[in-house]
Amino acid sequence: SENLDQRVLFFMQILMLSSSRVNNCEYLQDAKPAILDHLHLITEAVFVPYAGISVSYDSYTQQVQAALPEISITGLHTYADPVQAILDAPAILVGGGNTFHLLHQLQQLQLIAPIQQAVREHNTPYIGWSAGSNICGATIRTTNDMPII
């Protein structure tokens, strides 16, 4: 029989939310207790705004910051080296919007593997809502988003 200390334990801190709004609540307010609990004592996060196509990335980041004032949030789009920003992030937040645009941007910027590495190997907390949760699966083939980039 295998000893527990010989096994590889695989634990990821992932919070997937179906939506940013529930029951006419303000943006992220229904999920806020779960988000803060998931982050525990973490007070900084990198926000991936690439699913947002109807607002600027700066505006989207500001919207998330306003909804979560307890956390200092920096948009990934502001970093000179987004790969390193993901690897160094205390937590990763990925917003909703267009799943196909989000995935396209992550592929173009070569961020999929670094996000996986951060979450799997560094145990970095990940929180995604809507499109940000859709990309957690093995494929986005089952999303009901329009396939428009």
Model-predicted regions and their roles:
Residues 4-6, 11:
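Short hydrophobic targeting helices and cationic amphipathic motifs
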Residues 96-102:
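Short, basic, glycine/proline-bearing loop/turn elements
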Residues 103-105, 112-121, 125-149:
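Class I SAM-dependent methyltransferase SAM-binding "motif I" and its flanking Rossmann-like core
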Residues 12-95:
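N-terminal beta1-alpha1 cap of cysteine-dependent amidohydrolase-like domains
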Residues 28-29, 59-60, 104-107, 139-141:
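Short amphipathic alpha-helical segments
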Residues 21, 52, 98, 133, ...:
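Short, glycine/serine-rich, charged loops/turns that create anion-binding
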Residues 75-80, 108-111, 115:
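Short acidic (Asp/Glu) patches
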Residues 95-96, 129:
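Short His-Asn-centered micro-motif
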